[in-house]
Every structure is written in C-alpha cells, then in structure tokens.
C-alpha cells in the first residue's frame, strides 16, 4: 500500500525524535514515507512536497522541527491536508522555542501541535491513526487495540516496585 502519512523533518538530526513517530506508525500498520525537507534550506522542495502530497495519496503530514520550527506552518500554508507539528527538543531552550513557533499559527492556517520531543512524536502517530480511522477502519481498530493494551499494562502492574 502506498504511504498515507508523510513524516517530514527540518534536518537529519531531527530523526532522533521523529523515529519514534515511525516506530509507532509501524506498530499501528500505517504506511508512511520519511523525508528531510527544510523550510529554510530547501523552501522550494517544501512547497513542492506540500502541494503534491494529496495527489500522491497522503492523507496526513507530520512535520517535526526544532529552533525556529517554521516547517509545520509553511507546510500547512501549502496544503489542505491535516498537518501535525512536532516540536523537536533543542539543547538551547529545551524545545520551548520550537513549541511556540509551531503552536502560534495565525487563524486560517491550522497546525495541530503536539508535545515537545518523544511524547509528541509518538502522539503524532496516534493522532494520525485517529484521523485516518474515519476513512480506514483498520487504523481505528489498531488505535483501539493500542489503547486497550496500554490500559492492560498499567492495570497488570499497579505496584511500581515490581520489576
């Protein structure tokens, strides 16, 4: 099956965060593609990617970026697909700069912004499953199963002292 989710990042170093997105998409059985697309270094490539995404069969774009983090917003400006922004944790400001860059979008160009770092990367994949589930019931079921397993794991291990 061709990719339904595009996972893009501003630089190769962002893979340490976005790899968690890929891992969760794999667990959910959602087909995806991965690409480095920089809003600042390769803006023409970004515009082309965003403009052609829907025609290539993508239904959701997950965009992770650190620092100025313009990738999710610029991507959202060039597509009508849902764009999920993942702020990458930076050494300088711990990702708060990225979070604020992604979350403060002007009205009319929405970006669904997730948490900073690994949690946001994982949740972006889960949110993708929720979005895709309306059209593709197998991803809704995969998400339900993931949540049930998560609940079961907690209930099976109520004492944190048990290894």
Curated annotation (Swiss-Prot):
Isomerase keyword on record: yes
Chain's gene name: purE
The family this protein is said to belong to: Belongs to the AIR carboxylase family. Class I subfamily.
The protein's name: N5-carboxyaminoimidazole ribonucleotide mutase
EC top class, as a word: isomerase
A Pfam family that the UniProt record links to this protein: AIRC
GO terms (BP aspect): 'de novo' IMP biosynthetic process
SMART domains named in the record: AIRC (SM01001)
Coiled coil (residue ranges): none
Phylogenetic placement of the source organism: Bacteria, Pseudomonadati, Pseudomonadota, Gammaproteobacteria, Pseudomonadales
């Amino acid at each position: 099956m061709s990719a339904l989710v595009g996972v893009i990042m501003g630089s190769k170093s962002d893979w340490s965060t976005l790899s968690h997105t890929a891992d969760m998409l794999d667990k959910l059985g959602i087909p995806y593609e991965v690409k480095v697309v920089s809003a600042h270094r390769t803006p023409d490539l970004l515009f082309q990617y965003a403009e052609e995404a829907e025609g290539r069969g993508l239904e959701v774009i997950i965009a992770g970026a650190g620092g100025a983090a313009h990738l999710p917003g610029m991507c959202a400006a060039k597509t009508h697909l849902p764009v999920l922004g993942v702020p990458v944790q930076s050494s300088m400001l711990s990702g708060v700069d990225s979070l604020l860059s992604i979350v403060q979008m002007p009205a009319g160009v929405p970006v669904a912004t997730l948490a900073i770092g690994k949690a946001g990367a994982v949740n972006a994949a889960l949110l993708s499953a929720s979005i895709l589930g309306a059209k593709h019931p197998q991803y809704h079921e995969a998400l339900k199963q993931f949540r049930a397993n998560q609940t079961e794991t907690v209930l099976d291990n109520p004492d944190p002292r048990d290894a």
